Amino acid sequence: MSPKPSENGIDGDDERDEEEEDSEEEEAEEEEEDEPRLKYQRMGASVPSLLSADAATCIAVAERMIALGTHGGAVHILDFLGNQVKEFAAHTAAVNDLCFDTDGEYVGSCSDDGSVVINSLFTDERMKFEYHRPMKAIALDPDYARTSSRRFVTGGLAGQLYLNVKKWLGYRDQVLHSGEGPIHAVKWRTSLVAWANDTGVKVYDASNDQRITFIERPRGIPRPELLLPHIVWQDDSLLVIGWGTSVKIALIRTTQSKGANGTYKHMSMSSLNQVDIVASFQTSYFISGIAPFGDSLVILAYIPGEEDGEKDFSSTIPSRQGNAQRPEVRVVTWNNDELATDALPVHGFEHYKAKDYSLAHAPFSGSSYAGGQWAAGDEPLYYIVSPKDVVIAKPRDAEDHINWLLQHGWHEKALEAVEANQGQSELLDEVGSRYLDHLIVERKYAEAASLCPKLLRGSASAWERWVFHFAHLRQLPVLVPYIPTENPRLRDTAYEVALVALATNPSFHKDLLSTVKSWPPRIYSTTPVFSAIEPQINTSSMTDPLKEALAELYVIDGQHDKAFALYADLMKPDLFDFIEKHNLHDAVREKVLQLMMIDCKRAVLLLIQQRDLIPPSEVVSQLIAARDKCDYRYFLHLYLHSLFEVNLHAGKDYHDMQVELYADYDPKMLLTFLRSSQHYTLEKAYEICVKKDLLKEQVFILGRMGNAKQALAVIINRLGDIEEAIEFVSMQQDDELWEELIQQSFHKPEMVGVLLEHTVGNLDPLYIVNMLPNDLEIPRLRDRLVKIVTDYRTETSLRHGCNDILKADCVNLLVKYYKEAKRGVCLSDEVDDVSSRRGEKSVSHLGERTMSLKSVEVKSKTRGGGRCCICFDPFSILNVSIIAFFCCHAYHTTCLMESSISVGGKKEAGVAAQRTTSYDEYPNGVNDDYEDEDEEEEEEEDATSGALPMRCILCTTAAG
């Protein structure tokens, strides 16, 4: 495995031998490198100066401080940074073991001088106990500061384990065990005390003064004084033992006994404790220290050389050969699966043996461990002690994990780790920047661009920096789709640079179009983009997407006419809506062909509506000029046909062309066109119809040309339609043509029969019958003759009926005219209401004639040339009412009234006076039955107004 990165001067290295075989080195390089589980830091502050003149032997860790023992017999109290807080000159020989109580108020130490010293950290209290033999291990009661018994256990080379308890009369030692060799280690947890001697590990319950179990010393390992055993409580029930090359984990279980009443009764631990070995494995290295690491283990490993053996361990003096391996920190599972291995280059490691190293840990908040990670501040600390070094190891946190991933090029995993741990924005920025730099170096520009929204987030400055960086690398087009337009909004220059980069690269013209459509126009200026695009117009790099993008920019800039020209070239389907929206009818003039090709129907409608702006000559010339680009003749036909329907004469110059166009595209409409138009050449039209074999059209043209006989021959010989021939001859009103028709029909008896059926109203059937040859056989002749006679009678009857109706209409109209003519018109300066109403009704019935008569009378009155037909006095101009009749007689109103009364002195006159308006009889002998209803209406009107009936005296007398 490759060397681990250095942290604060400590390098991790997995090399075991600098002279390994080449094959092993290659295999190690091929293995995937595992991430370290721990990070290391050499303890500084006061420690280097302390160890420069002395050597460390052991260490103990409390919740708030550290105790370091030395060969000189001193106990140094340090904070976690290595600063010395206190110093106890406790012993005269090397300190072998240290121990804090749970509260961290007392520290106990034992030494080769045979003494045990317990010092209070916060008071001057100090107790010293002499045992006169080197003491190797000590453990304070976890509740030492809380109880008055002040218990501790200690042992050494004497082979006796002492329990020291404070009594009424002072401190008293109780020997818990003896006779099985020196006591090498002791640990106290709750009420359980575990110690190791030459035979193995034993556990004692201090609460009941009873030994619980014995765990035998592993076989095949050097003597305990050469390879010390290491024991540590992982929790209240798990005891971890590392001895030589063996690891065992013992579980001390508490069981419950069922009482007489069926309930569970809690009994004392000593009576029910059971010990199970839950894990056990062998190692390939010597164990110099062991500690729990969550649900795994941390082992301080000493790697033996080939010459290492029991003989070498017999000396406690450091080796002078200088060939020892570096100590290693290994993280393993309970099944000895290796999770991490780190070699520590401590000072002077070449000369140290396994017993020169020790390991202590501080698992104060181990309950926060979950999923391989500890909460911030709760991670355990591990202290590796060598004679001249103290190295702190602690679990790597999320930031360390991220840095390790970055150093190994796993930027994506680093980013995922940052996001999963909701890292600080500064860390995310750093990871993002390094990730992007890595991708840029690898030339993975597209991937880098896709990650920018996630990595740069809302930082406008970061976005702008990367925009210009991509631009410098000529890779800005791949970043454009991800550039934000809001939150954050960048400077206009950034967007303009992006658009220019897209515009100058034909491969990204489609992206330019989509970008222009999606970006708000307010965030950039179009001028730089115009400057980048316009030089490409009419060049090979002017692609359709670039044209459309330029058109969109013209729209944004308000240059709709330029945009229309580009849209027309691009044949955009919504071009017609664009024209209407921006009123661009003037611009249509130059783009007739494009409009026709987009949608010929809408184009024709537009051109017809705007024919004043775009004359037909312009349209026709553009379409003819495009003969190589499209079916221009079809477009011409559509346009000229619509133009002809709107205005028969608007396209008269092209009617000759239209004849041919109709013949090609719409022959059914040609005949209608020929009948409606007067602006085409008959000869040319006839040639086209002959060429296209359009028979009816030939007949029509021949008829207009005066070749009626030739037209008739076409009908009979080509069409074979005798009815059409009869209709044609009837329209020509030429007797000779009838004879021609009859003569040509004789050759076809069936035509003669049809001719006989259609002669009524046109020819005398007898004339045709007389001309028929005697031997001519006519199919269904009898039936046809019967039909001829029947049709003739029907025609005669219809004519008589029509004559009768005509006569009746004449009589009715004459009577109506006479009745209107009998009415008078009052001419006066002041006309009463009744006369006005009656005059208005008369005017409405008489129309223009009444008004003209009134004009004549007014002029006569003005001139004064008229005379009353009764008194023969001339009419005065003022203050005299005059009654004028359509018979050209006029009277003074007073004269006419007096004459009417005198003439009507008889009874009939009285009756006539009571009626409003009536006529006794008409001069022509027609009675009043024709207009009874009209007269009744007239009488009702006169009766309502109270006026007397007015009649021309002269005409009435003459009629009588």
Swiss-Prot record:
* Protein's UniProt name: Vacuolar protein sorting-associated protein 41 homolog
Which family, according to the similarity comment? Answer: Belongs to the VPS41 family.
Annotated region (Disordered), positions in chain = 1-39, 917-948
CDD domains in alphabetical order: RING-H2_Vps8
**Positions of the CHCR repeats?**
607-754
Report the function annotation for this chain: Required for vacuolar assembly and vacuolar traffic.
WD repeat start and end residues: 90-132, 178-214
Name a single GO cellular component. Answer: late endosome
UniProtKB keywords: Protein transport, Repeat, Transport, WD repeat
User: Which organism is the protein's source?
Assistant: Solanum lycopersicum (Tomato)
According to its UniProt entry, the protein's GO biological process terms are:
cellular response to starvation; endosomal vesicle fusion; gravitropism; macroautophagy; protein targeting to vacuole
Spans of biased composition, class Acidic residues? 10-35, 928-943
Query: Mind telling me which InterPro entries this protein's record contains?
Result: Clathrin_H-chain/VPS_repeat, TPR-like_helical_dom_sf, VPS41, Vps41/Vps8, WD40/YVTN_repeat-like_dom_sf, WD40_repeat_dom_sf, WD40_rpt
